Every structure is written in C-alpha cells, then in structure tokens.
Amino acid sequence: MNRIDVHHHFIPPAYVKAFNSTPGDPSGWHLPKWTPESTLSLMASHSTRTAILSLTAPGTSIMSNSPVESANLARQINLYGFQLHQENPTRFGFFASLPHLTPETIPSAVEELAYALDTLQADGITLYTRYSGTGYLGHAAFAPLWEELNRRKAVVFIHPTNTASDAQNKPEMVNPKLPQPIIDYPHETCRTAVDLITSGTISKNPDVKIILSHGGGTLPILATRAANLLYDAGLTEITPETFLEQARSFYLDLALSGNVGNLELLVGKNGFAKPGHVLYGSDFPYAPVETINKYVGMMEEFFAQGGDKEEVARGAAAELFPRFRIEDNKEMIPQNRL
C-alpha cells in the first residue's frame, strides 16, 4: 500500500537533552524512547513508505523562558530532520520546528521558517494550538507569520498542546490519571481552528494548507453548532455557510482517530471532510504500538465496506507532498525493508 504517515513524531537527541533539563511536558505525558530504527520498524509493520516527521508539543516551547535557547533548539531539531531525510530520502520527510512564538519572537520565527523551507527543504512547518503569553493561532501577533506562510503556499501541521494554565501556572487536569492528551487535546485543536476562522486568519491566508491533528479533534462535531450560534447571536458577520466552508478547508489526519464511527463522520455519506482532505497518521511513538495497530485494523474494517482507501493511505498526502509521489521516485520500497 505504501502509506504516507503525516502524523509521526521524532525525538532528536537535542530535544531529549532540553526536555530533561526542565520539569517536563506540562500536559502530563511522558517522553517515550525513540530511534530512527523504531520508526522504520513501525512503518514496515503497516506498509508505510514515508513518514513526515514532526516534533510534538511542547516542542521548542519547553524553553519558552529563553528565546535564544528556544531558537537554538529549533535549529538543531531542523538540522536533525534534514539529516534523516538525506539519509533516507524516500522514507523520511519532516515538518520544521519554530522557536516559541511570542510577539517579540515572530521575526526570528520567520527567519527560521525561511531557512527550513529554502535551505533544508522541509515539507512544512509545525505549529502548536496555542502559545503561553500570546494565545491561540488566530491572535493578531501571529499575522506576519501567517502572511509569510500564505505567500509561500506552505503546509502547516497543527498539533495540540497543553491547555491554558491556572493562576499558579500549573496545567489543569481532570484527575492525575487523565493527562491532557487523552481527552483535552482534541478540543484544543477545535479551539484553535475556530479561532483561525473567527479571527479572519483563514480568509486572509487562503493559500496555506493546514493539517489538523487527530481528525480535526472536536471540530467536525462542533462546526455546525459554532457556525450557526455565532452568526445568529450576532457575534460574527461570518455566515454559517462561509464558516463551514472554511472549517472544511482544513486537512485532517487520522492519528488516533481512524475508528469506524469517526471515519463515517469524516468520509462517509455526507461526511464533513472535503474529498482529498483526510490523511493517514499513526502518532508514533507517543501512541503505543498496540493502540496504533488497533486503529489501522479499524481503518481496514471501514474501507473493506467501500471508500477510497488508497486516497486516505497515500494519495491525498502525495498531492500535498509531491516529492513523495511514487511515480516521481520510481522505486517501490519493499514492505518488509528497514
């Protein structure tokens, strides 16, 4: 099948060092062990030809107290991603990391964006759903970044991060056994997506191609509610039709979201997603292999009843990332090759 996995994380040595120098991930999730070989092994088990690697949250924001260290970490991560692609050009792509975003660091973020896309030939840029001290991605401070991304017609991979903290700057959890990635992350994705729509960011930057993690989180469920309530209550001039059109402009990956019911919601009859806007994702190595295997099985079950499995598995992603089209690269990677 030669899948393209657009939601596949790597953990560069520089990030491990930075992570271990801090209190850790404020979402409550642990840092798993990872090697390029472990990624290739997972890819082989699911006939995945290419993984687009990205750094999960909190990413360079783990060094948010030091703009210089955050920028240096972003550069190290991007050089590592470039190295992996050079060593395995058909197996690995990567989304570049940016420094922690604040109004003051936007210029350096734009510089890193240019370096990553022009010099390192990154496949796109990773952004997180919100940044402490600024807010969600529709904030006016981020406008210059979106303008540059739009000018370049770039691909942006949006990954959820920890929710806003309490007054003591301590992330709030439902209980100690429910780290935020379990149930909070999907709604964080919805929050930033709706913020991008209502702030006018989407309408002003129509050429950016945005991938939302985890099937768009709760956006497919809440989009119609938000579209109508906002307009009917006089809270926005965006008509419900325009709101829903913009909500459907996002690309949606299936990491931890490829169960039968969710696939029916996204790509079934009258599905939320636009044709060609649903992409395969695994969420390795943060999702256990056992969980990934279950979701691949559920996807197979759904597509056994019909639907364009090839488009979701690789076709839609190949349109976004032309360098990984099989016809461009000729050689087919054997499914059991590491």
UniProtKB/Swiss-Prot annotation:
GO terms for molecular function: carboxy-lyase activity; hydrolase activity; metal ion binding. Its EC number is 4.1.1.52. Keywords: Decarboxylase, Lyase, Metal-binding, Zinc. Disulfide bonds: none annotated. Pathway: Secondary metabolite biosynthesis; terpenoid biosynthesis. The macrophorins cluster contains a single gene insertion (encoding for the terpene cyclase macJ) compared with the yanuthone cluster that produces the linear compound yanuthone. This is Decarboxylase macB. The lineage of its organism: Eukaryota, Fungi, Dikarya, Ascomycota, Pezizomycotina.
